[in-house]
């Protein structure tokens, strides 16, 4: 999919660059593969904001995407490629030989009419899924599982991918887009290819209203708030915050290391921060 730029006939169209989605399916999604979504406005069960800058936006139906790909050795044909409002990647509707329909993440270079299959060892072809134990080293993959059978969790956003770079005692080594080198069990599944819609990050939405349609609210600076709302808030007139930049909860926000270590850190061979100064 290419980018589409617009002539500045209105202020909202000046600088507007969007993805050309003319080749995608224009109808509604498959009814049995969608469910309703209730808007939370970024609040949790106690009513507190746990995710800032969320709220409003157009109504959505959630498309149930198969991230597990555990239907082994049953070929499926791609019926159509669809837009999914819940993610940056496109999704593909596939029909298995036994008649079952499913949505999968659409990789780059997957077209309508192509055949995909999941199995213990399959062809290295976009859309095919297999565990790392049956995969040749050097393969570009996406939708990578962290735990066998849990479903893909890594490399699912538009244009992302990981590279299978080696094996080591029951583990597969993968290099992620961020530069991180990590291990996962060889029984973990991954899908061949890079995720579709690589130009997603090159879009320019042109006006605030388009982001509001997507459910994104304005970002307010801490120094513009009251003292109750943010450590940088308050003061007479404009202030610089009066302290080193912090988050609303008082943690350093300009590079201070604040993350706790966790058990799975031992599976990270090289951190994505390895090249940073002082790391």
From Swiss-Prot:
The gene is rplB. Keywords: Ribonucleoprotein, Ribosomal protein, RNA-binding, rRNA-binding. One of its GO terms (biological process) is cytoplasmic translation. HAMAP family: Ribosomal_uL2_B (MF_01320_B). It comes from Cereibacter sphaeroides (strain ATCC 17025 / ATH 2.4.3) (Rhodobacter sphaeroides). Residues 224-279 are annotated as: Disordered. Residues 269-279 have a biased composition (Basic residues). This is Large ribosomal subunit protein uL2. One of the primary rRNA binding proteins. Required for association of the 30S and 50S subunits to form the 70S ribosome, for tRNA binding and peptide bond formation. It has been suggested to have peptidyltransferase activity; this is somewhat controversial. Makes several contacts with the 16S rRNA in the 70S ribosome. GO terms for molecular function: rRNA binding; structural constituent of ribosome; transferase activity. It comes from the Bacteria. Part of the 50S ribosomal subunit. Forms a bridge to the 30S subunit in the 70S ribosome. Belongs to the universal ribosomal protein uL2 family. The keyword DNA repair does not apply. It holds the Pfam family Ribosomal_L2_C. The keyword RNA-binding applies. GO terms for cellular component: large ribosomal subunit.
